[in-house]
Amino acid sequence: MARLIGVDLPRDKRLEVALTYIYGIGRTRATETLKATGISGDLRVHELTDDQLVALRDHIEANYHVEGDLRREVAADIRRKIEIGTYQGRRHRSGLPVRGQRTRTNARTRKGKRKAVAKKKAK
C-alpha cells in the first residue's frame, strides 16, 4: 500500500479512484491533480514511482485542505454557527436536519431511533 498524506491508498485500484480515499479529494480534484502533475489516471497505485508519489503529495499539500486540517475546519465552522446562534447552529445542536429537509416523516438518520409512545387508554 502506498501512503499519501497519512492515508493508505489501495494498491490495485486506478490512481484516479484511489486518490478519492483521501478526505477532501473527490473525482474532480483527483483528475485535476493528475493533470497538473502529468501522471496518467490509468496507472495502478502499485505501479507508481517514488518521484510520482512525491509530486502528488507536494501538489495536494500546496493546493488543497485535506484530511485532518479539513476535518478541523468543518468542525470549527459548525462550532461557530452553534456559538453565534444561527438557525443552522440551532439545528446542529438539536440533532435535526440542517438544510431544510422535512422532519414530520423521514429524517430518521439524523433524529435517531424512534421513541415509543404509549397508546391512549380506553375508557
Swiss-Prot record:
Residue stretches of biased makeup (Basic residues): 101-123
Family recorded in the similarity comment: Belongs to the universal ribosomal protein uS13 family.
Species name: Cutibacterium acnes (strain DSM 16379 / KPA171202)
One Gene Ontology CC term in the entry: small ribosomal subunit
GO BP, sorted A to Z: translation
Keywords, ordered alphabetically: Ribonucleoprotein, Ribosomal protein, RNA-binding, rRNA-binding, tRNA-binding
Subunit structure: Part of the 30S ribosomal subunit. Forms a loose heterodimer with protein S19. Forms two bridges to the 50S subunit in the 70S ribosome.
Protein name: Small ribosomal subunit protein uS13
Region (Disordered): 89-123
Pfam families per record: Ribosomal_S13
GO molecular function: rRNA binding; structural constituent of ribosome; tRNA binding
Function according to Swiss-Prot or TrEMBL: Located at the top of the head of the 30S subunit, it contacts several helices of the 16S rRNA. In the 70S ribosome it contacts the 23S rRNA (bridge B1a) and protein L5 of the 50S subunit (bridge B1b), connecting the 2 subunits; these bridges are implicated in subunit movement. Contacts the tRNAs in the A and P-sites.
